[in-house]
Amino acid sequence: MEREQLMTELRKKEDSKVYAELGYRDDSVIPLLIEIMETEKTAVKYQAEKAVRKISEERPAMLLPYGDRLIGLLDSENNFIKWGMLLTLPGLLEAGGRDIWGK
């Protein structure tokens, strides 16, 4: 999926489960969701954060390759993104991502 296509979907403000399902079906979606959280100035980043959080609850192992980037979001200037990561990262630990903290 292309970034602009995903942005269009996120602007629809569907339930986060809808966007998590996109990530389950197409693994190119997950890094795009993270990129949107890292770079997007508009409110669409919140939909991306909710989708990543849902993935961390249901299939956290899918996020392990992106652990460094997710930890980096703890330094976001946006408090909602920071708080979202505080809810997301424990799922990675449960999925065996304990080594992401040592990097």
Task: Map each language-model feature to its residues.
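Amphipathic alpha-helical scaffolding segments comprising HEAT/armadillo-like alpha-solenoid repeats
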Residues: R3, Y24-M37, P60-L73, A95-K103
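Ordered, amphipathic secondary-structure segments that act as subunit-interaction surfaces
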Residues: N78-D99
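Short inter-helical turns and helix N-cap capping residues of alpha-solenoid HEAT/ARM repeat scaffolds
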Residues: E40-T42, E77-N79
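Conserved hydrophobic register position within alpha-solenoid helical repeats
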Residues: V18, A48-A51, M85
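Structural signature of alpha-helical solenoid repeat scaffolds
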Residues: L10-R11, R53, P90-G91
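Charged, compositionally biased N-terminal leader segments and the immediate start
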Residues: M1-R11
